[in-house]
Regions:
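Structural marker of alpha-solenoid helical repeat scaffolds
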Residues: 55, 89, 122-123
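Terminal, low-structured helical/coil segments at or just beyond the last alpha-helical repeat
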Residues: 114-154
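Canonical positions in the second alpha-helix
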Residues: 51-52, 85-86, 119-120
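Canonical tetratricopeptide repeat
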Residues: 65, 99, 133-136
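Register position in tetratricopeptide repeats
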Residues: 39, 72-73, 106-107, 136-143
């Protein structure tokens, strides 16, 4: 009798886990579609990114994508909340770190962006995200230095 109960429990548990995995995959697919259509239909991309969060509210990638779409839409403050949620679920998600740091740069929060760069370098030193973020930070620093020099000249 105990073996039957254990078998039923394990079967049910396996069923639940397989359902969660498929919801996660659906959420990822919806998020990827949102990124793909952003340039042609911003409103639809925003709706899709929200649907991805409904499909799996604990999907760090979906939160990062939703934040990135807001960032691209220049809604930096709103985007920040989505990136925070993404990094709560997965503090090493390279897309979450990269897009969040780009958002920090847009908000002139260079210390936060540099912290995320350090995490990216430690977790995926050769990945595209760490290289692109380093370039973005260098560009922002050059702009800041150039502005400082032109201000001093006046």
């Amino acid at each position: 009798m105990n073996i039957i109960k254990l078998s039923l429990f394990l079967s049910f548990f396996t069923f639940i886990l397989s359902g969660q995995t498929s919801l996660n995959q659906i959420s990822n697919d919806i998020s990827n579609n949102a990124l793909l259509i952003y340039e042609t239909d911003k409103d639809e991309a925003i709706l899709l990114s929200r649907q991805a969060l409904v499909a799996d509210p604990s999907n760090a990638y979906a939160w990062a994508v939703a934040g990135n779409i807001l960032r691209k839409n220049q809604e930096f403050k709103k985007a920040e909340n989505f990136f925070k949620k993404s990094l709560e679920f997965n503090p090493l998600l390279k897309e979450g770190l990269y897009w969040s740091a780009e958002n920090n740069i847009s908000l002139d929060q260079l210390d936060e962006a540099n912290q995320k760069l350090k995490i990216l370098i430690n977790s995926c030193s050769g990945c595209n995200e760490s290289v692109m973020l380093k370039l973005s930070l260098d560009k922002k620093k050059a702009q800041t230095n150039s502005n400082d020099v032109s201000t001093k000249d006046n």
